[in-house]
């Protein structure tokens, strides 16, 4: 069998083992504690609203001006006047509050949010994040991520481990314009759960079922730290 076909077959096998975007969100939801106020960024983070563990009281914030965001609506039950920061239709929970974005960012800058979950294009081994611009591509603006990374107490990144070209997004140093520096604490990808250590480096905590540590190592351009046996990621 030609080498290129063997490589393609291996990648297909890994893709089948790796977590979906929904499963990434479900794994991140396990990090949420009772009583938390949580900001959900655009992309994969918005899916977390569908997987809040039962039995805990959590208030989800959307930066466009909402406290008490619920899961996505069922088909046919959408209300076009209720959207999140990513312009997706949402639901609200009893006791929810709607207000202007100035008040929303006042909450963020005053560090009233316990946990922020963001998407990213790149994260460095020192916790730097790039998630707002790819040079040469038109963007409407920076968005709210820079306020969040400057003010949040705890930030988890939900992202794909590699880009569409198969290049790692977990780097020694970010190549894209930065959103914030030394601010990311944890990363969840389709392949792994990793801590970003204060001294630098990605510490591997969990791996997707069927995905080897060696494959994660090959998919990580920054410093990967592996200690002992690495358990598989669990969703329940």
Segments and roles (model prediction):
Residues 12-16:
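Intrinsically disordered, low-complexity polyampholyte segments enriched for Lys and acidic residues
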Residues 17-93:
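N-terminal active-site beta-alpha-beta segment that forms phosphate/nucleotide-binding
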Residues 19-23, 74-236:
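Conserved phosphate- and dinucleotide-binding cores of soluble alpha/beta proteins
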């Amino acid at each position: 069998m030609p080498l290129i076909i063997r490589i393609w077959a291996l990648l297909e096998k890994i893709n089948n083992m790796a977590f979906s975007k929904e499963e990434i969100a479900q794994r991140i939801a396990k990090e949420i504690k009772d009583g938390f106020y949580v900001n959900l960024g655009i992309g994969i983070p918005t899916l977390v609203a569908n997987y809040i563990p039962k039995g805990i009281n959590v208030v989800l914030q959307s930066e466009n001006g909402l406290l008490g965001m619920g899961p996505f609506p069922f088909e046919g039950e959408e209300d076009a006047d209720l959207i999140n920061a990513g312009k997706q239709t949402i639901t609200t929970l009893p006791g929810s509050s709607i207000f202007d974005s100035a008040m929303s960012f006042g909450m963020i800058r005053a560090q009233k949010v316990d946990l922020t979950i963001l998407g990213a294009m790149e994260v460095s081994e020192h916790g730097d994040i790039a998630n707002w611009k790819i040079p040469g591509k038109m963007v409407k603006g920076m968005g709210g991520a820079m306020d969040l990374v400057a003010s949040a107490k705890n930030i988890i990144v939900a992202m794909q481990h590699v880009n569409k070209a198969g290049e790692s997004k977990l780097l020694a140093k970010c190549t894209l314009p930065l959103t914030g520096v030394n601010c990311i604490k944890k990363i969840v990808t389709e392949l792994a759960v990793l801590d970003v250590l204060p001294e630098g480096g990605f510490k591997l905590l969990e791996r997707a079922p069927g995905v080897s540590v060696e494959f994660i190592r090959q998919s990580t351009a920054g410093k990967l730290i592996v200690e002992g046996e690495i358990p598989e990621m669990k969703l329940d």
